[in-house]
Amino acid sequence: MKKAVKRYWNWGLSVLVGIGMFLFWYVWYPHALSYQEQYQLFLWTGDYFVEKISLPGGFADWVGEFIVQFYYVEWLGALLLAMLFVALQRVILRLLNSLTSHLSPLTSILSLLPVAVMWWLMGDINVMLSLMVAVVMAIGIAGIVGKLGLLGRVGSLGIAGEIVLVPMIYWLIGPAVWIYVIIRVIQTGWRQLWTAGWLVAVQLMVYAWLLPQWPLQQAMTGLSYYRIPLQYPQWSGYDKDMYELIRLDYLVRNERWDEIVKRAGEYQVKTPFWCNCVNLALSQKRLLADRMFDFYQSGEDALIIPRTRDLTSMLPSAEAFWRLGMVNSAQRYMFDTQESILNGKKSGRCTKRIAECMIVNGHYQTARKQIDILKKSLFYRSWAEEMEAMIEAETEADQTTPNPSYSGGENSVFGKLRKMRYKESFLYSYEEIDKMFGLLLMNNTDNKMALDYFLAQMLLNGNVQGFQQYLGLAQQYGGYRQMPLGYQDAMRCIQAQGNVAGSPYANYVKRMMAERRGK
């Protein structure tokens, strides 16, 4: 009876771990899954597998990426991740069972501690899933070897077997092999410290000989456990501001504009990234002219930030460029973002957008290269095949120049962007971004987002003369029944020289002036 109770207790604990983790990732943190998925592109090819396992820890990395690709479907990704946490808890529970004479409820609860540590560690957005996969595999292999007695308990034969097995496991899972070594030392009851020290020395010499191209520090701490080379996970947990920005980017990616505006009213993260996301959402709801200064604005970079070589900052600006019709700028920002992924991986999200930009510009040969890559993935394959068929149809029509009537028709996304984009290629500096918005509007007066961004950028820059000069464009091309509230407030502020109580724009101007004086 007691055995049955213990068995049900243990399985009940595992079920609770699975349910808790599933709800955490699917209900509260789906944006964290999306963040991880968008910075890799798992390919279903033999070459990709060989490329991965040619590096130490490559198999764990391959398995981790295999799981992460399913984060594209949130509930499925959350389910697989929850199952991995359950696997971690179960292998630890079995290990404790093998090391103790009896399994008490306290021992079962102790099996939750490594799960909690791994969960908290994964709050660092740069921790890769391969770390957790490697830990599970290390404990699991040690448990199997110990249970079957494959290498014996003591003696030179057992040590020789470990010397052969440890490098093999290292090549599969990376430095997490030392978890295996420690467990085996406990299982075999080795009493001589020189044996473990000698084993470590042999392993270090083998790694230095096999991996001359990698710094020993990186080889010993993992090539694929952390996104940033030669750095280590931070014990930071789930930083509220960081994950709020990740959530906004996730909502932008999925075009959930109402949720962005709602969240912006509840919690603000005072960064240009946050402003870019919120202002883009306002523009898509045609609320930018009315409500822009109801929210925090970081300054001249509140609509579009200048080029920044990291893997996150430029994403909302790239999405804004795409919807404005500044296709080349969107492509440049997405390309720079992809090349800024420090572990050298590709991005499914960026690759898809780059291909779309090439299609809009009529660069079909280069677009096909991106499409061919996406066809080897799981969740981007259907889109890639659809784009390939569309390009073939347009090519067969023998169109010498891109035509909005193709690529899905004039009312398709590609058709609209071809009508809105610049017709000539030229260079511009970030300081002239307001002029670029104005040129977009003159190129196509139906581009209401360009109109909103043009006037908003002048207000952000403090260019009140330009704003007054071009305000009539809002009446002429904006489709407004009355002047937007934000523009009315700005005009009152300008006319009263900022002495307007409760004016959102006046408050913005005063804050900018105070910040500049502080510098």
Identify the residue ranges that each predicted region occupies:
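Start-transfer (signal-anchor) and selected internal transmembrane alpha helices
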Residues: 1-21
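Membrane-interfacial interhelical loops
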Residues: 30-70, 117-129, 207-233
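Membrane-interface micro-motifs in multi-pass membrane enzymes
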Residues: 35-38, 53-57, 77, 81, ...
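Loop-to-helix entry region of an early transmembrane alpha helix in multi-pass inner-membrane enzymes
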Residues: 71-86
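Short hydrophobic alpha-helices at membrane interfaces in multi-pass membrane enzymes
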Residues: 102-112, 146-164, 191-196
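Transmembrane helices and adjacent periplasmic/lumenal helix-loop junctions
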Residues: 120, 129, 149-187, 203-210
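Soluble catalytic regions of membrane-associated enzymes that act on cell-envelope
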Residues: 235-421, 440-464
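Terminal, low-structured helical/coil segments at or just beyond the last alpha-helical repeat
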Residues: 439, 460, 496-519
